[in-house]
């Protein structure tokens, strides 16, 4: 057998062993969980369902009008009018609406689940992936994914569907990117921390003791659905990303490498698109 063929087979065997160890460990935690865990899982799923529903109902960039109407009904007419003026500002209105969206992500994907987990369910934050876990042992896998993503991101950044969507926040015409655009990008990046916590921490880690390795699959469908409206390749890629990031979250017991990887992908895409549009010079 050629040496390179043997090396590939060895690496594939090591990868299979790593996958099986993570799956078996997650399933062992399910088998070892005390009776009555289903009630806690049901409560967690209910909170997740409310968070997803509210994000869809009032959290999109175009849904600020619901909040404005609520302010009016509460008697805060001037605040509602100020909000409307801010959202409809001719030059920066589109970015203001995206700020509204990003802040809603922080509320529904991060603050509400965290409040329930700490105040009601008494779940340690480390059990939801917010600790360092076994991060160091799995950093090479995340670094490999970043290297794998780089050429793919550079390729799709030239496609018309992605050029229309990205960057999410629009640079002001004729204005330098720093500081205004990059301040908005920081808010955009923070949104990914909330998303990673919700899907890979709250759902995957939070449901590990009830569903075992299948907690990844529980989180996969809603994760794909939040990408609806984006370019089709990105929607389909979210299924692969959900599986891979879910597995790595279970393996490392931490969401933080996934947060960094998500931010790396977003920053690379935005920089590549800005460069292709001639806005980096």
Task: Please name every model-derived segment.
Residues 1-124, 273-281:
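N-terminal, membrane-interfacial amphipathic/helix-forming hydrophobic leader that caps
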Residues 45, 123-126, 134, 202, ...:
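Generic structural microfeature
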Residues 36-45, 98, 102, 106, ...:
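Residue-level signature of transmembrane alpha-helical entry/exit and packing/kink sites
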Residues 10-14, 51-54, 147-281:
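Transmembrane helix-loop-helix hairpins at the membrane interface
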Residues 109-110, 128, 223:
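Long, contiguous hydrophobic alpha-helical segments, chiefly transmembrane helices and signal peptides
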Residues 67-105, 119-191, 209, 279-281:
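Juxtamembrane helix-loop-helix connectors linking adjacent transmembrane helices
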């Amino acid at each position: 057998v050629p040496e390179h063929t043997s090396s590939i087979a060895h690496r594939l065997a090591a990868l299979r062993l790593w996958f099986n160890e993570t799956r078996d460990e997650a399933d062992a935690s399910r088998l070892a969980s005390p009776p009555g865990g289903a009630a806690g899982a049901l409560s967690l799923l209910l909170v997740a369902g409310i968070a997803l529903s509210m994000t869809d109902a009032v959290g999109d960039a175009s849904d600020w009008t619901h909040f404005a109407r609520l302010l009016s009904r509460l008697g805060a007419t001037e605040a509602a009018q100020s909000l409307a003026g801010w959202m409809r500002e001719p030059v920066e209105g589109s970015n203001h609406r995206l700020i509204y969206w990003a802040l809603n992500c922080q509320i529904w994907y991060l603050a509400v689940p965290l409040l329930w987990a700490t105040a009601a369910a008494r779940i340690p934050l480390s059990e939801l992936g917010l600790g360092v876990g076994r991060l160091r042992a799995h950093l090479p896998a995340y670094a490999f994914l970043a290297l794998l993503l780089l050429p793919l991101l550079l390729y799709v950044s030239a496609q018309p569907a992605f050029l229309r969507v990205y960057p999410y926040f629009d640079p002001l015409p004729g204005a330098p990117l720093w500081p205004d655009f990059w301040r908005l990008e920081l808010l955009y990046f923070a949104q990914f921390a909330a998303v990673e916590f919700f899907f890979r921490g709250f759902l995957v880690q939070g449901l590990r003791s009830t569903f075992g390795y299948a907690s990844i699959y529980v989180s996969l469908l809603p994760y794909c659905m939040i990408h609806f409206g984006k370019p089709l390749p990105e929607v389909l890629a979210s299924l692969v990303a959900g599986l891979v990031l879910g597995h790595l979250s279970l393996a490392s017991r931490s969401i933080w490498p996934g947060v960094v990887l998500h931010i790396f992908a977003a920053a690379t895409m935005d920089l590549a698109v800005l460069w292709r549009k001639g806005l980096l010079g």
